């Protein structure tokens, strides 16, 4: 962002650059429309400079970023879009722990712990 030019919000990325169209999708790959929603962050169309392969391991790149959802680039991040259209990364979708059959993101647990005023910072490893 450009200082004093780009409007910013704490904990949020700025608005998308021109030509980059982020979308949120559910587990089935259906686009989640509207604001005030959460889902998996994908990029709808290719853009200059986008990752297309990894040297020496094209298949790994294809599987990780292009095979999860048809015709979308999947970042691997969970994300929320607020009322103003700003995006906040909520954590990696593959960074989860299983507690009694419930999949819980480690970032969610860290955020809950960090709500306590006596906790400066926490890290959860599962």
In which residue ranges do the predicted regions lie?
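Adenylate-forming
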Residues: 1-4, 20-22, 50-54, 97
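Active-site loops of AMP-binding adenylate-forming
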Residues: 1-10, 26-28, 56-60
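Short Gly/Pro-enriched turn/cap motifs at secondary-structure boundaries
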Residues: 9-16, 32, 64, 69-70
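A short, compositionally biased
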Residues: 15-20, 92
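Glycine-centered tight turns that cap/initiate beta-strands
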Residues: 19, 60, 118-121
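Conserved beta-loop-beta connector loops within the AMP-binding
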Residues: 23-45, 50, 83-84
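Hydrophobic alpha-helical segments, especially N-terminal targeting/anchoring helices
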Residues: 25-26, 67, 75, 81
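AMP-binding/adenylate-forming catalytic core of the ANL superfamily
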Residues: 47, 52-53, 71, 78-126
């Amino acid at each position: 962002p450009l200082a004093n030019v780009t409007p910013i919000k704490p904990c949020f990325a700025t608005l998308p650059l021109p030509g980059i169209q982020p979308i949120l999708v559910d587990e089935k790959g259906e686009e989640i429309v509207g604001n005030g929603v959460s889902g998996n962050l994908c990029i709808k169309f290719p853009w200059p400079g986008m990752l297309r392969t990894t040297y020496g391991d094209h298949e790994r790149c294809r599987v990780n970023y292009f095979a999860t959802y048809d015709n979308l680039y999947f970042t691997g991040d969970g994300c929320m879009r607020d009322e103003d259209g700003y995006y906040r990364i909520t954590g990696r979708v593959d960074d989860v722990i299983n507690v009694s059959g419930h999949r819980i993101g480690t970032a969610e647990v860290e955020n809950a712990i960090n709500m306590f005023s006596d906790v400066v910072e926490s890290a959860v490893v599962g």
